[in-house]
């Protein structure tokens, strides 16, 4: 749940290039999923980028496994939002 460096951030792209959004935390990533172009989500999910970033940058193997293959924007948002709420609750 920490804030990431620019090098660690998730940079949203599409087949034609960067789409102008970068997430510097899991919270911000979930918020940006609501507004990034749908083709960006599809692009990253087809390549496995989201699961890879979650596993290797955020070190959350469970969430990475859960998001693998999910193509529906709302399902991704719901799953990630539930996970981040659980993680925040453990810090309180």
Describe the role of every protein-language-model region.
Residues 1-92:
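Terminal, compositionally biased segments used for targeting/anchoring and flexible tails
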């Amino acid at each position: 749940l920490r804030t990431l460096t620019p090098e660690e951030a998730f940079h949203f792209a599409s087949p034609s290039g960067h789409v102008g959004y970068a997430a510097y935390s899991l919270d911000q990533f979930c918020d940006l999923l609501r507004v990034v172009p749908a083709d960006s989500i599809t692009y990253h999910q087809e390549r496995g980028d989201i699961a890879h970033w979650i596993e290797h940058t955020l070190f959350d193997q469970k969430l990475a496994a859960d998001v693998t293959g999910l193509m529906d924007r709302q399902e991704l948002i719901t799953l990630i939002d539930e996970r981040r709420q659980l993680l925040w609750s453990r810090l309180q």
